[in-house]
């Protein structure tokens, strides 16, 4: 995720019989299945609906690729990120990095939506994402990364010894992508999608 992003804690829900995920494994109590996440976020195939619900397009209007992060080009792309500042706990500009108080992990209402530019100029919803800031997560008493359906979030911290910003201009954080709207050969929880493309991206003239 990249750009400006009060945290809504994930409420534990007592479940007697855990539902099945798309892969057929039982979802942990209180967590939605992949099918449920897909169904609940299908409405955001309309960018106008996403904007009306408080999602904001990345002010930098960047379509992110693996190559930008110092990875081989064939690793794939992410896309253009739209985010909810309230769910990420972001209340101001970078200083010097984008930082917030967010610890929101409920994929029923993801903090980030990811779109892939299409040849006709439209945007296709491909994935959803949650991002939590490391400092806030640990301050809440957590000693391990958040997880979703048994998959640990990725720990993102910049390494000043490299030219690439591994944390994408963000303060240290955890994030997890879930590709429920586009098949991903690398896996539903991979950061990048080898079948994705940013070739049709036309940055907005006003973006900076």
Where do the language-model regions lie?
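Bacterial N-terminal signal peptides
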Residues: 7-19
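Positively charged n-region of N-terminal signal peptides that target proteins for export
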Residues: 1-4
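Primary mode marks residue(s) on the alpha4-beta5-alpha5 output face of response regulator receiver
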Residues: 23-208
């Amino acid at each position: 995720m990249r750009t400006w992003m009060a945290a809504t804690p994930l409420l534990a829900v007592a479940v007697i019989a855990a539902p099945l995920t798309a892969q057929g494994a039982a979802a942990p109590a209180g967590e939605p299945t992949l099918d449920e996440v897909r169904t609940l976020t299908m409405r955001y195939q309309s960018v106008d609906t996403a904007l009306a619900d408080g999602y904001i397009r990345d002010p930098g209007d960047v379509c992110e690729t693996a190559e930008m992060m110092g990875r081989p080009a064939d690793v794939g792309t992410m896309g253009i990120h739209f985010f909810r500042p309230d769910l990420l706990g972001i209340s101001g500009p970078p200083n010097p990095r984008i930082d917030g108080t967010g610890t929101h992990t409920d994929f029923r209402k993801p903090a980030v939506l990811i779109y892939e530019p299409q040849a006709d100029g439209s945007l296709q919803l491909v994935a959803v994402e949650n991002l939590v800031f490391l400092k806030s997560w640990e301050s809440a008493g957590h000693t391990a990364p958040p997880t979703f359906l048994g998959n640990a979030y990725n720990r993102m911290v910049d390494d000043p010894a490299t030219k690439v910003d591994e944390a994408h201009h963000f303060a240290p954080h955890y994030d997890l992508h879930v590709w429920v709207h586009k098949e991903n050969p690398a896996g539903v929880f991979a950061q990048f999608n080898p079948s994705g493309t940013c070739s049709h991206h036309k940055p907005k003239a006003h973006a900076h």
